[in-house]
Structure formats: C-alpha cells, structure tokens
C-alpha cells in the first residue's frame, strides 16, 4: 500500500493487476486500484476535482483531470472515510501513477491533497518501477 498525508487528510492506495482484463499479446495491461481517503482534520471538506499523471514504462505521459471521482464529489466531515475503486489500462507491462485531489472547505478554501505515487507492475516482471 502507498500512503500520503496532506493537512491531516490521508490517501491510501492499493493497486492490483487485473489479469482477466489484460491481454499481453495485444499490449493491453489493466490495473485496478482501491483508494481510501480519511479526513483526520478538524474541518469538513468536499473532493471537487482530481488530477492524475499516468506514465507508462516508455515514459509516455497521460494527464487526466475532472470533477470528483467515479461520478461523485464526496463530502467528508472530520473523522469520515471515503473509499472507491477504479482502473487504468496501459500499453506497457508497467507504469506509474500519482496525482492530487482538489478539496474545498465549507468556507470555500481550495487546497490540494496528494495522491501518493504508486507503481503498476505486471506479475512476473523482473524490474519494478516503484
């Protein structure tokens, strides 16, 4: 698992390879990832936007931005946890992802919360990226 802490908001990522959706002979490699966001701060926040940097093993970068996550913009009161799962296809057997969530307090303050860098490694790889 990979962890990042920003302003007492913790983001934990657990990536996993989806063999049944992958087809290495067609250069299709698919990973899922589970994310848990815990608000350990003293203020409520809403996740309003996301930013991902996805880099394959050849250095090809794909940047993804958009509102919320999986169609939601969850509000986390102090002590709340939000969990979701998503996925990422690549054309190479390994890659790296990192990013941030833009959060907004009830008072309208916007700030970024780091998503830790995590590696996407196919089973059986001799060299891993992270």
Swiss-Prot record:
InterPro entries: ApaG_domain, ApaG_sf, Uncharacterised_ApaG. Residues 63-83 are annotated as: Disordered. Residues 3-127 form the ApaG domain. PROSITE patterns: APAG. GO terms for biological process: error-free translesion synthesis. SUPFAM superfamilies: ApaG-like. This is Protein ApaG.
């Amino acid at each position: 698992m990979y962890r990042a802490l920003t302003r007492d908001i913790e983001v934990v990522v657990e990536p996993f390879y989806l063999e049944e959706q992958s087809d290495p002979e067609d250069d299709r490699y698919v990973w899922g990832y589970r994310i848990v966001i815990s608000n350990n701060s003293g203020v409520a926040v809403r996740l309003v936007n996301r930013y991902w940097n996805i880099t394959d093993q050849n250095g090809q970068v794909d940047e993804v931005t958009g509102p919320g996550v999986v169609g939601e913009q969850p509000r986390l009161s102090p002590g709340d946890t939000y969990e979701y799962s998503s996925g990422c296809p690549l054309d190479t057997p390994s890659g790296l992802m990192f990013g941030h969530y833009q959060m907004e307090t009830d008072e309208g303050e916007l700030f970024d919360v780091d998503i830790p860098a995590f590696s996407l490694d196919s089973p059986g790889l001799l060299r891993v990226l992270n």
